[in-house]
Structure formats: C-alpha cells, structure tokens
C-alpha cells in the first residue's frame, strides 16, 4: 500500500488520470472568417476536451468582419459558455492571420497559446497530446504534423495532396526548418515565445506559419511534434486560392534569400 502511494506521488501532476496542472492556462486563438456553421461545433469540442482533461483554458475568437453572421454566433457562444471561457474580440475587416494572433494575444491571460483552424480541420482531441509532449520535453513549441508517424490528411483529392507534399518537400530542401510540417497551423507555444516570433515575422497569410518555424530555428527555440489527422473542412469554402499559392511561392523565395 505504501509503495503504491509513493508511486502515485512520484508521478508528475499532469500524468495521472489525464489531469493537467491547474497553474498552467491555455489560451486558444481562433481567427474566423465566414465560419458560422463550423464555430459552434469546434467550440463545443474544445470545451469538451478541456473539461474532460481538467485543463484550465480560455477560447478567444477573433472574427474579421464575417458577412455570414459568424460574430452573432460567437456572441451566443459567449452567453452559453460564459465570458470567462469564451472571449469575443472582433475586428472590423479581414486584416491577416498574423495580426489576428497579435490582436488575440493582447487579450490572452494564459501562459500557453494554442493556435488552430476554426473550420474543424484540426480536432481538439489532439490538444492533451500537445500538452503532454510539451511537458515531457519542456519544448518551447509543439507543432502538429501531417507528415510524421501516423499523421495524415483526409478529404483532399490526389491533386491537392501532391501539391501539399510537393510544397512541404521544397520548403524542407530550401529552408531546413527542423520540423516535418512547415505549413501546418495547429500549434502550441509558450506565450512569450509566440510574442517574440511574431515580432520577428514579416510575412502575411499562409506564409506566416512557415516563417514562424524558420524564425524559431534561428532563435534556437525547441520544437516538439505530435502526429495529427488533418481533415478537410466540412462546411464552407476553402480560402486557399490562386493568389494564396502565388503568395506562398514568393514568401518561400523571400525566406530562402533572407534566412
């Protein structure tokens, strides 16, 4: 009996029964644009995952003037779950992903920041794994990866999979980032690390995520990885178009020339 008690006490506070340290708080930044159909479900899944794991959290919704009523849905979610758990911090118009994170961090009270897509491409069930990984290695960043272990992509046609794999391969060759999924956007950061990286980054749009990892390598931040399943959005239209692809290629060449 005594040995069992000693064994329980010797474990870290976050390990037993899936519980996590209450002194740590995790702020989820959810930038949204035309996500009225997806937002209620992703928030419900987040609340469920955090509650079941005993994780101290808040969800910050940064809506960029969505014309489809996303802001109205977000206001209802604040009433349902409480203003201490759901914070709506909207902006008047679409101003870019990087500035959305900056805006959200101004209101974040957690010592860790989680960034993810609001379109159900990233399942909150992986978040406890992110946290465990961070604790195990004391990492500055934990990144979800589609290209390692049992990670993968679901719902894409062959053409899009080839484009994604090709883009990731090229970035690995040119930038050598020290992470297997450079363009992913499901990550956990120490708050002060994310603040420092955003100060250093100059890219916008989809290139922003790529530059974050490249700058992290330059600043000698440690990166852990968790394999994830990326699922293509169920509702709404993808925001990745021709302009975004051109911007990605320009951004890649800029990073190659400056890092």
From Swiss-Prot:
Mg(2+) binds at residue 119. Coiled coil: none annotated. Its EC number is 2.4.1.83. It comes from the Eukaryota. It comes from Sus scrofa (Pig). The modification N-acetylalanine is found at residue 2. It is found in: Endoplasmic reticulum. It is an enzyme of class 2 (transferase). This is Dolichol-phosphate mannosyltransferase subunit 1. One of its GO terms (molecular function) is dolichyl-phosphate beta-D-mannosyltransferase activity. InterPro entries: DPM1-like, Glyco_trans_2-like, Nucleotide-diphossugar_trans. GO terms for cellular component: dolichol-phosphate-mannose synthase complex; endoplasmic reticulum membrane. Gene3D superfamilies: Spore Coat Polysaccharide Biosynthesis Protein SpsA, Chain A (3.90.550.10). GDP-alpha-D-mannose binds at residues 31, 33, 35, 62, 64, 117-119, 146, 233, 239. Keywords: Acetylation, Endoplasmic reticulum, Glycosyltransferase, Magnesium, Manganese, Metal-binding, Phosphoprotein, Transferase. It catalyses: a di-trans,poly-cis-dolichyl phosphate + GDP-alpha-D-mannose = a di-trans,poly-cis-dolichyl beta-D-mannosyl phosphate + GDP. Binds 1 divalent metal cation. Pathway: Protein modification; protein glycosylation. It holds the Pfam family Glycos_transf_2. The keyword Cell membrane does not apply. The modification Phosphoserine is found at residue 3. Disulfide bonds: none annotated.
């Amino acid at each position: 009996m005594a040995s069992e008690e000693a064994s329980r006490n010797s474990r870290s506070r976050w390990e037993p029964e899936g519980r996590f340290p209450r002194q740590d708080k995790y702020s989820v930044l959810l930038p949204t644009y035309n996500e009225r159909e997806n937002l209620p479900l992703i928030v419900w899944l987040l609340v469920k995952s955090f509650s079941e794991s005993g994780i101290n959290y808040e969800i910050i919704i940064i809506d960029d003037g969505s014309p489809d009523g996303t802001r109205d849905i977000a206001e209802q979610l604040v009433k349902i779950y409480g203003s201490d758990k759901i914070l709506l911090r909207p902006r008047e118009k679409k101003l870019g992903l990087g500035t959305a994170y900056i805006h959200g961090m101004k209101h974040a009270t957690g010592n860790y920041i989680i960034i993810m897509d609001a379109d159900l491409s990233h399942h909150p069930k992986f978040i406890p794994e992110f946290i465990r990984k961070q604790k195990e290695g004391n990492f500055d960043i934990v990144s979800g990866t589609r290209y390692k272990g049992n990670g993968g992509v679901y719902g894409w046609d062959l053409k899009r999979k080839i484009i994604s794999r090709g883009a990731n391969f090229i970035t690995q060759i040119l930038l050598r980032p020290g992470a297997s999924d450079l363009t992913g956007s499901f990550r956990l950061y120490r708050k002060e690390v994310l603040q420092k990286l955003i100060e250093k980054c100059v890219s916008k749009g989809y290139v922003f995520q790529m530059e974050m990892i490249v700058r992290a390598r330059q600043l000698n931040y440690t990166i852990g990885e968790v394999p994830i399943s990326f699922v293509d959005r169920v509702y709404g239209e993808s925001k990745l178009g021709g302009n975004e692809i051109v911007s990605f290629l320009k951004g890649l060449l800029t990073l190659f020339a400056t890092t």
